[in-house]
Amino acid sequence: MTLAKIELLKQLLRDNEAKTVLKQTTVDQYNIIRKFNTSRIEKNPSLRMKWAMCSNFPLALTKGDMANRIPLEYKGIQLKTNAEDIGTKGQMCSIAAVTWWNTYGPIGDTEGFEKVYESFFLRKMRLDNATWGRITFGPVERVRKRVLLNPLTKEMPPDEASNVIMEILFPKEAGIPRESTWIHRELIKEKREKLKGTMITPIVLAYMLERELVARRRFLPVAGATSAEFIEMLHCLQGENWRQIYHPGGNKLTESRSQSMIVACRKIIRRSIVASNPLELAVEIANKTVIDTEPLKSCLTAIDGGDVACDIIRAALGLKIRQRQRFGRLELKRISGRGFKNDEEILIGNGTIQKIGIWDGEEEFHVRCGECRGILKKSKMRMEKLLINSAKKEDMKDLIILCMVFSQDTRMFQGVRGEINFLNRAGQLLSPMYQLQRYFLNRSNDLFDQWGYEESPKASELHGINELMNASDYTLKGVVVTKNVIDDFSSTETEKVSITKNLSLIKRTGEVIMGANDVSELESQAQLMITYDTPKMWEMGTTKELVQNTYQWVLKNLVTLKAQFLLGKEDMFQWDAFEAFESIIPQKMAGQYSGFARAVLKQMRDQEVMKTDQFIKLLPFCFSPPKLRSNGEPYQFLRLVLKGGGENFIEVRKGSPLFSYNPQTEVLTICGRMMSLKGKIEDEERNRSMGNAVLAGFLVSGKYDPDLGDFKTIEELEKLKPGEKANILLYQGKPVKVVKRKRYSALSNDISQGIKRQRMTVESMGWALS
């Protein structure tokens, strides 16, 4: 600045007005610079933000009642100024004002927040109820795996989720729902109810719903548990040299759905392989299987992974599967090479000759068994090299054995010492390669003794492994353990495969990648309810599953069954559904239970006292030919015991864990699942809970009497004393006066009159059912 300019400035400052303007309007304010800047594009956004936030009052408050609630200062800290922001015309305030507002500001209406941000509140619940253990320091072996980032309410493909979200938020604009959308109607209905009346913008609702329904998966380095409940807290559970023990609170719905899907697929395959056409039966059962309220096909489409059984059912239903090959517990993915199969006769160690398909050609595979991963190189009848990572001894041992068998090494064939005639759960003889697999998993010493040992490698990152799966100076020939991490399969590619009649999956190249023999024979209890809507499958289930499926079928066909019963059609007991139910009744009791159940139902029909819940309860027990006492009388029971012991019984005259009925709500509870009978019980029968078909214990004594007041409800009628009168609406809505009987001797007469009307109605439609 020149001397002349300084003189001019001093002269200007002598003018009080000019001095005030210059003092109050600082030219270093960013907003003023921006206002007179010709360019609208921000040249350096980062610098702009830093510059703004370094000033005392970088924020602008919109004028109004809310802004007035913030004081000028709090405990010596200035929160705002009365100066006006030139750019926004708002009041200027400091960043401390935000902290003050969050801490001391008014609390608005938060109704609906928990419903909208449910996934965040559930995360907080899991965190609040979590158990934290100690932190351990030291090297952590983390493996890159494809993991789900956060738990989901219900996993589904993105396009399906967008249709469901549209149906929840904009039902009028969504149009006619597709079948794939409509199968989620329970979820749609539940979410609509929850979100009704919330004042949050639809875009936020849509984002939060997407977070609950669409899976976000990433390849992340993980040590230990990989379920979404752990992955959402991964940042505070492990690092390169530390680990924190943590167990989340709450339940794991996604895992339950996936686990139930695996259980269902395994059972379907186990049932199908004994059929004349396994593929046809598997498709039929799979299309009629529901997990919770969702079709199995929808689960298989939405949920990533599963096991061999899931992939076989996917292929049967025409869905794509991940690029994998299976050999029992061993999972393989080809890295390079190609093999060609030729049938050869092989002399094995026990002196027998087996015809086996031998693979010729050099091949390299990425292999996995449980948590143990490795790289396998093989040629014709020889395992060249197997490099594995350190894991649980059981997984390491199984991986080594399965790779030795899969390689069809001559030493493996020579290691057989005993019989290799193994059967699957269906009682079918396994093929030779699966016989060998089963044999050596049970008798590993035969294989390791024959295999031989060699000196361990000298490299620092490699070590040998002995027959006890311990690090050693000598190692099983060709087998090496690396201290480095072998990452999990990273491919996400899917492919369409063809499936044979016997449930073998074949690639376009003709290579068999898995089959029914690769399905695990482990049996486990499903965490969610599985419904197989076909009697062909029911006998495979547990007692509870069979009870549930049978009674569900009875409810579905109740009108037909009831009509046939009232018309006296005895062949009505011979349904396929009841044949499956018979398999859970102890054999020596089946005839006695049938005789008893048929006698009770006949008595109900003859005395014309229809009790729908009792009819449903006893009907499945009537399948077997009835067995009576020597005098022709039926055996009597208060409890009908089923196979399996424990809670597997049905009480005849009261509720039990398997079957109970609430006449007030007209709800049946079958194995814990509620099923409504509303609309399936006639008004006359409903009133019989008070005594009879018309009104047990009451006599219709005339027309409506205004002096007696309003119409009484059934509950109020029960409180009347003998001889008292009241107005009621009869079952067809007819207003009448009734008097409570002093004696109950006419009870059966009341009942029979009502039932006769019901029976006449059924008989009039009998021609349609004959």
Curated annotation (Swiss-Prot):
Motif (Nuclear localization signal) spans which residues? 740-743
Which InterPro entries does the record match to this protein? Flu_PB2_2nd, Flu_PB2_6th, Flu_PB2_C, Flu_PB2_CAP-bd, Flu_PB2_middle, Flu_PB2_N, INV_PB2, PB2_helical
A Pfam family found in this protein is Flu_PB2_4th
Subcellular location(s): the record lists: Virion; Host nucleus
Q: Which UniProt keywords apply?
A: Cap snatching, Eukaryotic host gene expression shutoff by virus, Eukaryotic host transcription shutoff by virus, Host gene expression shutoff by virus, Host nucleus, Host-virus interaction, Inhibition of host RNA polymerase II by virus, mRNA capping, mRNA processing, Viral transcription, Virion
- Molecular-function annotations in GO: RNA binding; RNA-directed RNA polymerase activity
Determine if Electron transport is one of this entry's keywords.
no
Q: What subunit structure does UniProt give?
A: Influenza RNA polymerase is composed of three subunits: PB1, PB2 and PA. Interacts (via N-terminus) with PB1 (via C-terminus). Interacts with nucleoprotein NP (via N-terminus).
Q: What does this protein do?
A: Plays an essential role in transcription initiation and cap-stealing mechanism, in which cellular capped pre-mRNAs are used to generate primers for viral transcription. Recognizes and binds a wide range of cap structures of target pre-RNAs which are subsequently cleaved after 10-13 nucleotides by the viral protein PA. Plays a role in the initiation of the viral genome replication and modulates the activity of the ribonucleoprotein (RNP) complex.
The name of this protein is: Polymerase basic protein 2
Q: Which organism is it from?
A: Influenza B virus (strain B/Panama/45/1990)
